[in-house]
A protein has these predicted regions:
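Amphipathic alpha-helical blocks
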Residues: 139-180, 218-230, 248, 257-261, ...
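GIY-YIG nuclease signature motif recognition
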Residues: 177, 205-208, 250, 313, ...
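Non-catalytic, polymerase-adjacent accessory regions of viral genome-replication enzymes
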Residues: 1-187, 466-476, 481-497, 501-515
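Boundary/linker segments flanking structured domains
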Residues: 435, 439-582, 643-713
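Conserved polymerase palm-domain catalytic core
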Residues: 239-366, 370, 381-389, 397
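Conserved short loop/helix modules at catalytic or binding sites
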Residues: 389, 611-665
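Polymerase palm active-site segment centered on the conserved acidic dipeptide of motif C
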Residues: 276-280, 343-344, 351-430, 447, ...
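Conserved pre-motif C helix in the palm subdomain of viral-like polymerases
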Residues: 171-218, 252-256, 304-334
Length: 713
């Protein structure tokens, strides 16, 4: 399946509702942070918790702050009144057409591993390829194994006081990419297995390992590279002679080759530079207990102890590899190299050798034996006067370096007409030119390398006038970073879309200035310097393919969500939802209609949502409507009891307003709750019984996925 553009291009929103959902989600996140900031500003006697949260959000709704309420109401009204316009262009028409084709393709659309190709694979063939990849390295395990690991993780979460924020092990099915760069493709298909299932403890482990690695690098001064820029700095410091050559090595299957014993040895070694508490060590090792899922069924890695694994894409996988890299660098610099002669980036190493070819060959064998001693195997090249490393090509003979791309790897960039914020479109040529400048040792090399990138930009709709800023900008090593005040900023990140007519940025900043002028109690906390806006984006083309694949692999059939009605035959006519009372995952609507049409009260509407079959939620409402002790359970029951006290005859008509999926572990938000909140926001405020304060309410569907819901023995 061919796409002649970057999959990072973004089509315009297919529906207004899709945009408004994301806007409301981003707006809710902003309001929560701003509301908490306002609460602590108005209650200075309450000290903010010094608890380390590792980025996990507080699930609770923020408290009421009188001074913040007017801004909150105006902000939600701003979102409600966003205007849209009909717009488009030829490129957006093409994206819309391709999105439609993707959505209606019956096959799985699988990406290539190292190229930009995409392949349609029938469901049966995809299942076979996936099973072959999984059974090669994994074996089946039981749900009890996952429950045990979750219970162990829950104990740690309780000690961190984050049990109400951290979630159980996420159940996400593994997927594959096709290695179409391998020989004999497609007659012989090789795949790469990707495991997206993660543990939240990996986020904690990520922070611990990141700080640990930084401390080790600071003390040892070893060349643990984290960027191309640091490799170039090392290259420029090389004092090369006529006999200086490169030696390059690559650790094969680095992630899966790391054993528990090797990680423990690396931690023991690291403890000599920085104290590693028993708690932190336990967190790192507990985060290694990993599972893989196919159709929701768990698998665990073969030949490992206690489910140990470091899957690619895990929260702390890269940091684990960096720690192992630092450990191996220490061994290399003790036995084979001087500290300034070798460095490593993840699984790629690069060093220099002075002397004849036999010296380099001996070092190659020594490196291979050293890594083999720790259960790792490498491939290596020696006696190189020039070589590629990461995205740079280094030449020792003339001490030059230039940008490097693999053969047939042509760059692709977002189109000028993509649904991206204008500043990103405008700055892209300048950003690419600066990157090429960093990767080029001279202006001449920059100009020689520029053609392929300029042509790629032109293919993406950029004109010559757009490329005026595409020029060589040599990095200044003596340039000092501008000192910036460490100010706590609360960001609002609304989604950008070309179809939006309203100038959201202008209206938002004007609202902040108008709501919190000088003299306002919250001005020092919420002002134009502490509250800022930066646009996020809608789903790109790759996201649309991912969503398509999920819908094919995990079909939610109509029957699964349309279980009909189980009311007894003689009372079918009284079914509250017209024969659909067993439907789940819905936003429902209750219209309270006075029996007397001349009644001045008029029809009132209540909106709610349920992830359970509607009938169970209906019985909860029915109990509240017949039991005065439960009259304040919802605004619906409160209103009904007010009507009863006034002897107003009425009837309730139930209906389905929207359908949406309930929250799943690891998701960014609950689609069902968000649909309910959007319905409340857009409802007529005169006739609805719901309050907009419900928009900041806590999701009721997340708790069962939290570690706090586990009973610890």
């Amino acid at each position: 399946m061919q796409f002649n553009y970057s999959m990072k291009n973004i089509p315009m929103s297919s529906t207004v509702q899709a945009y408004m959902k994301k806007m409301l989600n981003q707006g809710e996140n902003f309001l929560r942070r701003a509301n908490w900031a306002a609460f602590f500003a108005m209650n200075k006697h309450i000290t903010q918790s010094t608890l380390e949260t590792f980025g996990f959000k507080n699930p609770n709704a923020p408290p009421f702050v009188k001074e913040f309420e007017e801004f909150k109401k105006a902000f939600l009204e701003m979102i409600r009144n966003i205007k849209f316009t009909h717009t488009g262009n030829d490129f957006q028409t093409q994206l819309k057409s391709d999105t439609f084709k993707i959505k209606h393709t019956p096959e799985i659309i699988v990406p290539a591993d190292k190229t930009r190709n995409w392949y349609k694979v029938p469901i049966g063939d995809h299942k076979k390829l996936l099973e072959e990849a999984v059974t090669k390295e994994y074996k089946r395990c039981d749900q009890e194994d996952i429950d045990k690991v979750n219970e162990e993780t829950a104990k740690i979460a309780h000690t961190l006081q984050l049990h109400d924020r951290m979630e159980k092990f996420t159940v996400r099915d593994a997927y594959i990419t096709l290695k179409d760069h391998k020989p004999n493709f497609p007659s012989r298909i090789s795949t790469r297995l990707i495991n997206p299932a993660k543990t939240d403890l990996g986020i904690v482990s990520h922070r611990i390992l990141q700080e640990l690695n930084s401390e080790i690098v600071s003390q040892t001064k070893t060349n643990q590279w984290r960027s191309t820029k640091s490799v170039i700095g090392w290259f420029n410091r090389i004092k090369s002679t006529a006999r200086t050559t490169f030696i390059k090595f690559d650790i094969e299957n680095f992630y899966p080759s790391i054993s528990r014993e090797l990680l423990v040895k690396a931690l023991d070694w690291a403890s000599g530079f920085c104290k590693i508490s028993d708690r932190n060590r336990g967190i790192i090792l507990q985060a290694r207990k990993t599972f893989l899922f196919i159709e929701g069924k768990p698998w665990t890695k073969k030949n490992t102890v206690n489910h140990f694994d470091i899957p690619m894409g895990s929260w702390d996988g890269a940091e684990c590899c960096e720690l192992i890299g630092l450990f191996m660098l220490s061994k290399l610099t003790q036995k084979i190299f001087k500290p300034d002669e070798v460095g490593i980036y993840r699984d790629d190493g690069l060093g220099t050798v002075r002397g004849p070819g036999r010296v380099a060959e001996r070092k190659r064998k020594d490196i291979s034996e050293l890594f083999k001693e720790y259960g790792l195997s490498i491939t290596s090249d020696t006696n190189l006067t020039a070589t590629d490393y990461l995205d740079v090509y280094f030449n020792l003979e003339d001490k030059s370096y230039r940008p490097f791309r693999k053969p047939n790897d042509h760059p692709q960039y977002i189109h000028k007409l993509s649904n991206h914020p204008k500043n990103i479109i405008k700055q892209l040529p300048k950003m690419i030119a600066y990157r090429l400048s960093v990767l080029s040792s001279t202006e001449k090399i920059f100009k020689e390398a520029s053609d392929i990138y300029i042509n790629a930009l032109r293919a993406s709709g950029y004109t010559d006038s757009d490329l005026d800023d595409f020029r060589y900008t040599p990095p200044d090593p003596n340039k000092k970073k501008r000192r910036q005040r460490c100010r706590r900023v609360i960001w609002f990140n609304p989604p950008f879309d070309l179809s939006v007519e309203t100038d959201i940025g202008h209206k938002f900043l004007a609202l902040v200035g108008r709501s919190f002028p000088k003299g306002h109690p919250l001005h020092s906390t919420l002002n134009r310097n502490t509250v800022k806006i930066s646009y996020c984006t809608m789903n790109n083309m790759k996201s649309h393919i991912d969503q398509h694949n999920k819908s094919i692999l995990n079909p939610r059939t109509v029957e699964a969500n349309n279980n009909g009605c189980n009311c007894i035959r003689s009372r079918k006519a009284e079914c509250p939802l017209d024969g659909k009372c067993l439907q789940d995952s819905i936003v429902y609507q209750a219209d309270i209609i006075p029996s007397d049409p001349n009644n001045n009260l008029g029809t009132k509407t209540y909106y709610g949502c349920t992830g359970r079959p509607f009938k169970k939620r209906y019985y909860d409402h029915k109990n509240a409507l017949s039991n005065r002790d439960s009259s304040k359970q919802t605004t619906l029951s409160k209103h009904i009891w007010e009507l009863k006290d006034k002897n107003v005859e009425h009837r309730i008509k139930w209906s389905i307003k929207a359908r949406a999926a309930t929250y799943k572990g690891g998701a960014r938000y609950c689609n069902l709750c968000l649909s309910e909140k959007l319905t409340i926001l857009m409802a007529d405020q005169e006739s609805t019984l719901n309050s907009r304060s419900e928009i900041l309410g806590k999701c009721r569907h997340k708790w069962k996925y939290c570690l706090g819901s586990i009973k610890i023995n």
